[in-house]
UniProtKB/Swiss-Prot annotation:
This is Serine--tRNA ligase. Consists of two distinct domains, a catalytic core and a N-terminal extension that is involved in tRNA binding. It comes from Methylobacterium sp. (strain 4-46). Homodimer. The tRNA molecule binds across the dimer. L-serine binds at residues 238-240, 292, 392. GO terms for cellular component: cytoplasm. Pathway: Aminoacyl-tRNA biosynthesis; selenocysteinyl-tRNA(Sec) biosynthesis; L-seryl-tRNA(Sec) from L-serine and tRNA(Sec): step 1/1.
Length: 435
C-alpha cells in the first residue's frame, strides 16, 4: 500500500509511476480524500476540546454560584456529547475511504523497469541452453497418458476440470522434484524451511495484496458448521502469503535481516480469468505444488537480494540441465504488488515455446505497509518498513512438465535427470505403470 505522505510530498512522481503502469493520475483524488480525512478528524478533535473546555467552565460557574450559566454550559456539553458519535463515525469513514482507495492501487514500477503494454514488451535478460533445445517432441500429457501414469479423466470425476491424478513413478518424480528444490534452497542457499498453514485469514491475504482486488481468483474455505456470514478462511494461492505474513505486525531488529524462508506447499487458484487457456495438460491447474522463496530485508538490501533470489531459482533449472531464459517484465505485465519482476521461462519442446516456471519480484515496502511489518535501525533506533521479496523456486508441476518434455526418449519413456537420482531409489527411467 502506498504512503499518502509520500504522495502529498511528490504527487507528480506518483502519477508518473501510475502512467507507466498505463493508469490514470490519482494523486489529486488521494490528496482530496486525505484532506477530507484530516478535516473529519479535526472536527471530532475540536468538538472534544470544546467539551473539555466547557467542563472546566461549568466547574468555575458552579464555584461562583452562577447556576444559570452552569445550566447553559451543561446544555452545550450535552449537545456536543450527542454529536460526538457522529463526528467519530465520520472520521472513521473518511479514513476507511482513503485506505480502501490506496489498497486498490498497484505498486509503482522501479525506474529501471522497461515500459510496455503486455508480455510482448518484456525484455530478455539471458539464456541457458542446458542439454540443448529440442525443437519438437510429444507434449507432457501425451507422454503421461500413454504411459498410464497421468489420468485427467479420473481427476475430472473427482474434482472437475483443471486437476490431474499422477501415479506410480511419475508421482514419485514429482515428489522428488519438490524435495530436490527444498534441499537445494535450505542446504546451499541459506533459506529456512517452513511448514505453514494452507488456510489463512482475510488479513493475511490483504497483507500480500491478494485481497481485495483478486478475490475472484481465490478459493474461499467456509466451515459448514458455522452460521451463514461468519468469517471463513482462504486456501493459499501461493506460500508467499503465509511466509511473508510471518513478519506481520512485528518490529524486527536490523541485525535479524535479511530473513529468508522457503516452503513446499500445495497452491490453490480459481483461475477465473483463464477460460480457454491451457485447457489440456498440467500447465494451468486449480491445485498445484510449488516451492516458494520469500525474503524480508532492509530497504538498502532489497535490490541485491532480488538478484540473489533469481540466481537461487535459476540454480534449480541449471542443476536439472533444462534450457531456459530470464525475462525482465515490462510495466504492463508486472504483478499488482511488484516493483520489479523477473520471470524464468523454461523451454517446452512439445509446445515449441518457452513457458513461465518462476517469477521473482521485489515489492519494496508495499506489502510491509499493508502488514505493518517494521524494523528498528541499529544506528539511530528509528523505525522503518521492511522490504519484501518473493519468488517461485520453482513451480513443481511445471518442472515435471519440463523434465518430461526435455528428457523424453523416442519410445515415449522419460530419462530421470541425474540431479534427481538420490530421490528416485534407483529409478532411472519413467515408463509404463510401474509401482
Amino acid at each position: 500500500m502506498h504512503d499518502i505522505r509520500v504522495i502529498r510530498d511528490n504527487p507528480a512522481a506518483f502519477d508518473a509511476g501510475l502512467r507507466r503502469r498505463g493508469l490514470e493520475p490519482l494523486a489529486a483524488e488521494l490528496v482530496a480524500l486525505d484532506d477530507a480525512r484530516k478535516a473529519a478528524i479535526s472536527a471530532a478533535q475540536v468538538a472534544q476540546e470544546r467539551r473539555n473546555a466547557l467542563s472546566k467552565e461549568i466547574g468555575a460557574a458552579k464555584k461562583a454560584r452562577d447556576e444559570e450559566r452552569a445550566r447553559a454550559l451543561m446544555a452545550e456539553v450535552a449537545r456536543l456529547k450527542e454529536q460526538a458519535p457522529g463526528l467519530d463515525a465520520a472520521a472513521d469513514a473518511a479514513a476507511r475511504a482513503l485506505d480502501a482507495r490506496l489498497a486498490a492501487i498497484p505498486n509503482t514500477p522501479g525506474p529501471e523497469v522497461p515500459e510496455g503494454r503486455d508480455e510482448h514488451d518484456n525484455v530478455e535478460l539471458r539464456r541457458f541452453e542446458g542439454r540443448g533445445r529440442a525443437e519438437s517432441g510429444r507434449q507432457h500429457f501425451e507422454l503421461g497418458e500413454a504411459a498410464g501414469l497421468m489420468d485427467f479423466e479420473a481427476a475430472a470425476r473427482l474434482s472437475g476440470s483443471r486437476f490431474v491424478v499422477l501415479k506410480g513413478r511419475l508421482a514419485r518424480l514429482e515428489r522428488a522434484l519438490g524435495q530436490f528444490m527444498l534441499d537445494l534452497h535450505t542446504a546451499e542457499h541459506g533459506y529456512t524451511e517452513v511448514a505453514p498453514p494452507l488456510l489463512v485469514r482475510d488479513e493475511a491475504m490483504f497483507g500480500t495484496a491478494q485481497l481485495p482486488k483478486f478475490r475472484d481468483d481465490q478459493f474461499a474455505a467456509q466451515p459448514g458448521a458455522v452460521e451463514p456470514g461468519a468469517p471463513g478462511r482462504w486456501l493459499i494461492p501461493t506460500a508467499e502469503v503465509p511466509l511473508t505474513n510471518l513478519v506481520r505486525e512485528s518490529i524486527l531488529s536490523e541485525d535479524e535481516l535479511p530473513l529468508r524462508f522457503t516452503a513446499l506447499t500445495p497452491c490453490f487458484r480459481a483461475e477465473a480469468g483463464a477460460a480457454g487457456r491451457d485447457t489440456r495438460g498440467m500447465l494451468r491447474q486449480h491445485q498445484f505444488t510449488k516451492v516458494e522463496l520469500v525474503s524480508i530485508t532492509a530497504p538498502e538490501q532489497s535490490a541485491e537480494e532480488h538478484e540473489r533470489m533469481l540466481a537461487c531459482a535459476e540454480a534449480v533449472l541449471r542443476r536439472l540441465d533444462l534450457p531456459y531464459r530470464v525475462m525482465t517484465l515490462c510495466t504492463g505485465d508486472m504483478g499488482f504488488a511488484s516493483q520489479k519482476t523477473y520471470d524464468i521461462e523454461v523451454w517446452l519442446p512439445g509446445q515449441g515455446t518457452y513457458r513461465e516456471i518462476s517469477s521473482c519480484s521485489v515489492c519494496g515496502d508495499f506489502q510491509a505497509r499493508r502488514m505493518e511489518a517494521r524494523f528498528r535501525r541499529r544506528e539511530d533506533r528509528g523505525l522503518g518498513y521492511v522490504h519484501s521479496l518473493n519468488g517461485s523456486g520453482v513451480a513443481v508441476g511445471r518442472a515435471l512438465i519440463a523434465v518430461m518434455e526435455n528428457y523424453q526418449n523416442p519410445d515415449g519413456s522419460v530419462t530421470v535427470p541425474s540431479a534427481l537420482a538420490p530421490y528416485m531409489g534407483g529409478v532411472t527411467r519413467i515408463e509404463g505403470p510401474h509401482a
